[in-house]
Amino acid sequence: MALNISSVLDELNIQISNGYQEFFTENRVQQLVDIMDTVKNDTFFPSILNIFRFTNIPVENIKCIFVGQDPYASYKFSDELKEDIVPEATGRSFEVNSMNTWTDKIKQSSLRNILKSLYYLQTGEKETLEKIREKISSGCFFILSPHDWFNYLEEQGVMFLNTCLTVKKDEPGSHIELWNDFSNDLVRYLNEKNPKIQWILAGKVAQNAIGSMVNNSICTSHPRLDSFVRECPFKLVDDIDWFGKTMQS
């Protein structure tokens, strides 16, 4: 049976018109069909409509790509009966689906340290998470709420990209090998089509995997490490409002 490319792209919610026409060739789409056939019997995250969320940003508009490894394999239950699960993965690296405010409990150390690093960027001070939350609540430190923050940065051209796009429930790293070839080709494509992209490569895994493929890399510790806070890669990225101040005004 002939491959119906348009149908596959629609099913996977891939926004090919945003500069990805040359990337999603017939061979590439067949590659995706093969990957999805491999994982279809797993409970995997994120939801199928969010796997290719990165295509929401037109290639020509990308200013910065913050590289993660694979989606969160954790989840929460949608109700007290614990019948339906809601994945923490959203299709954007480091974003946590269940976090609506910065005062919510942050289990993921990466997101905690990202918030601390943003506070350090604005104040030059390294502070505890509790103190930062107090300053957010009192209005002394302004930053958009978590989901609004990710949305706002995406609108400015910041892509939060995992090099592995799916994960099996409760099994971090379970799909990494499935996505290696696809991810390497995607990185090369984005770098070629938009050589001005600044790539935040946090941790040795990202640096070793991608560093030689891209023009403009910002190398830092992984966000789960405390050293990330003071290294603060955000200060090296051009023309990005990391807090939402322009929206506030």
Describe each region flagged by the PLM:
Residues 208-214:
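Short loop/helix-cap segments at secondary-structure boundaries that form the rim of catalytic
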Residues 214-244:
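Short, flexible loop segments at boundaries between secondary-structure elements
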Residues 14, 21-194, 198, 206-208, ...:
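A polyanion-binding, active-site-adjacent surface
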Residues 246-249:
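Cysteine-dependent deubiquitinase/ubiquitin-like isopeptidase catalytic cores across multiple families
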Residues 2-10:
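Low-complexity, highly charged intrinsically disordered N-terminal segments
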Residues 1-2, 192:
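Polar low-complexity intrinsically disordered regions
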